[in-house]
Amino acid sequence: MTCSITELAKKLISIPSVSPKDLGCQDIIIKRLCAIGFDIKRVNVNDTKNFWAFRGTGKTLTFAGHTDVVPIGQDKDWQTDPFQPVIRSGYLFGRGSADMKGALAAMITAAERFVNKFPNHKGRLSFLITSDEESSAVDGTIKIVEYLMSKRDMIDYCIVGEPSSTNIVGDVIKNGRRGSITANITIYGIQGHIAYPDLADNPIHKGLPVILKILSIKLDSGNDFFLPSSINIANIHAGNGFNNVIPGSLFVQFNIRFSSEVSEKHIQSQIVNILNSNDINYSIEWLFSGKPFITKKGLLIDTVIQSIFYFNKKKPILSTSGGTSDGRFIALMGSEVVELGLVNNTIHKVNECVKISDLKLLSCMYEDIMKNLLS
């Protein structure tokens, strides 16, 4: 079993599928799923490859994931070729090993074993796979969700294979994520010589008090599932590097991660009210990444906890920390969504790697969840 998982992971890692490119990863996965009786629906959009695979009918358990990876960074910083997977000291090295081609290999091999043992399983087992998770995410999972919703074909339970674990596989699972919205604000002044400030209008001087007011907004106090919402500056820029020029504009980018206690409209109104109450000329662009979502205790969480406890003899921590994930799109269907994946301490880093034993453990957990929900 370990060999099968490892070999599949190595095949996927060897393909340089930097987002949103797939470059053949999904063909490998689809071939294996077809061999065990899955029907396939491709939902490709622009440069993004997506597919929906399903087997059986009834209550639906979906495993969701992505074949794309982030860029490698500086090649010289890698100890090995990031797209030539290497096993060393019990670890599999390569870009995507932890995020999340290793988890994809664990899912597929788990499904193969499950179908072999339970060829007439109850319910429907399915896969939702995209190559646009690490970049814009506009042509990926959301397009499959829209396709399914147009057919009134809903997902009941979904396991997202994102690397949720901290120290050992299954020590942390994500039962929700915060929402995310970005405000790109440009404050306008009048460019001029810095020795003649009376002939110019410095947007930095005007903008700093406004920025501090925005940062001081208290949106909420959080709740049982989410920490308080946070506002942070992601980027700020003014001027052209010359020390004798008052710039004509100031750009500042705020990112807000928000709990279920507030809406994106409330956040927007709070920020716009501050901007309008000050004597400034500004423009603002909003980029909305997703609403917060939460899966409360129910059949899926109970089943996932049960499977993790069976192997680890310890229950996982339920968390909503971290960035956004494609779970936010699947949650739009009213699905119960849980993220369970590999250890995340090397994701997006040089020398990304995963324990071979963790691949085996995760695959066993996935198979046990299938068995408990569908056999």
From Swiss-Prot:
<feature type="active site" description="Proton acceptor">
    <location>
        <position position="133"/>
    </location>
</feature>
<comment type="pathway">
    <text>Amino-acid biosynthesis; L-lysine biosynthesis via DAP pathway; LL-2,6-diaminopimelate from (S)-tetrahydrodipicolinate (succinylase route): step 3/3.</text>
</comment>
<dbReference type="GO" id="GO:0008777">
    <property type="term" value="F:acetylornithine deacetylase activity"/>
</dbReference>
<keyword id="KW-0220">Diaminopimelate biosynthesis</keyword>
<dbReference type="InterPro" id="IPR001261">
    <property type="entry name" value="ArgE/DapE_CS"/>
</dbReference>
<keyword id="KW-0378">Hydrolase</keyword>
<dbReference type="Pfam" id="PF01546">
    <property type="entry name" value="Peptidase_M20"/>
</dbReference>
<feature type="binding site">
    <location>
        <position position="66"/>
    </location>
    <ligand>
        <name>Zn(2+) 1</name>
    </ligand>
</feature>
<feature type="binding site">
    <location>
        <position position="162"/>
    </location>
    <ligand>
        <name>Zn(2+) 1</name>
    </ligand>
</feature>
<dbReference type="GO" id="GO:0009089">
    <property type="term" value="P:lysine biosynthetic process via diaminopimelate"/>
</dbReference>
<comment type="subunit">
    <text>Homodimer.</text>
</comment>
<dbReference type="InterPro" id="IPR050072">
    <property type="entry name" value="Peptidase_M20A"/>
</dbReference>
<dbReference type="InterPro" id="IPR005941">
    <property type="entry name" value="DapE_proteobac"/>
</dbReference>
<feature type="binding site">
    <location>
        <position position="348"/>
    </location>
    <ligand>
        <name>Zn(2+) 2</name>
    </ligand>
</feature>
<keyword id="KW-0479">Metal-binding</keyword>
<keyword id="KW-0170">Cobalt</keyword>
<feature type="active site">
    <location>
        <position position="68"/>
    </location>
</feature>
<keyword id="KW-0028">Amino-acid biosynthesis</keyword>
<feature type="binding site">
    <location>
        <position position="134"/>
    </location>
    <ligand>
        <name>Zn(2+) 2</name>
    </ligand>
</feature>
<comment type="similarity">
    <text>Belongs to the peptidase M20A family. DapE subfamily.</text>
</comment>
<dbReference type="InterPro" id="IPR011650">
    <property type="entry name" value="Peptidase_M20_dimer"/>
</dbReference>
<comment type="function">
    <text>Catalyzes the hydrolysis of N-succinyl-L,L-diaminopimelic acid (SDAP), forming succinate and LL-2,6-diaminopimelate (DAP), an intermediate involved in the bacterial biosynthesis of lysine and meso-diaminopimelic acid, an essential component of bacterial cell walls.</text>
</comment>
<dbReference type="InterPro" id="IPR036264">
    <property type="entry name" value="Bact_exopeptidase_dim_dom"/>
</dbReference>
<dbReference type="GO" id="GO:0019877">
    <property type="term" value="P:diaminopimelate biosynthetic process"/>
</dbReference>
<protein>
    <recommendedName>
        <fullName>Succinyl-diaminopimelate desuccinylase</fullName>
        <ecNumber>3.5.1.18</ecNumber>
    </recommendedName>
</protein>
<dbReference type="GO" id="GO:0050897">
    <property type="term" value="F:cobalt ion binding"/>
</dbReference>
<keyword id="KW-0457">Lysine biosynthesis</keyword>
<keyword id="KW-0862">Zinc</keyword>
<dbReference type="InterPro" id="IPR002933">
    <property type="entry name" value="Peptidase_M20"/>
</dbReference>
<dbReference type="GO" id="GO:0008270">
    <property type="term" value="F:zinc ion binding"/>
</dbReference>
<feature type="binding site">
    <location>
        <position position="99"/>
    </location>
    <ligand>
        <name>Zn(2+) 1</name>
    </ligand>
</feature>
<dbReference type="GO" id="GO:0006526">
    <property type="term" value="P:L-arginine biosynthetic process"/>
</dbReference>
<dbReference type="Pfam" id="PF07687">
    <property type="entry name" value="M20_dimer"/>
</dbReference>
<feature type="binding site">
    <location>
        <position position="99"/>
    </location>
    <ligand>
        <name>Zn(2+) 2</name>
    </ligand>
</feature>
<dbReference type="GO" id="GO:0009014">
    <property type="term" value="F:succinyl-diaminopimelate desuccinylase activity"/>
</dbReference>
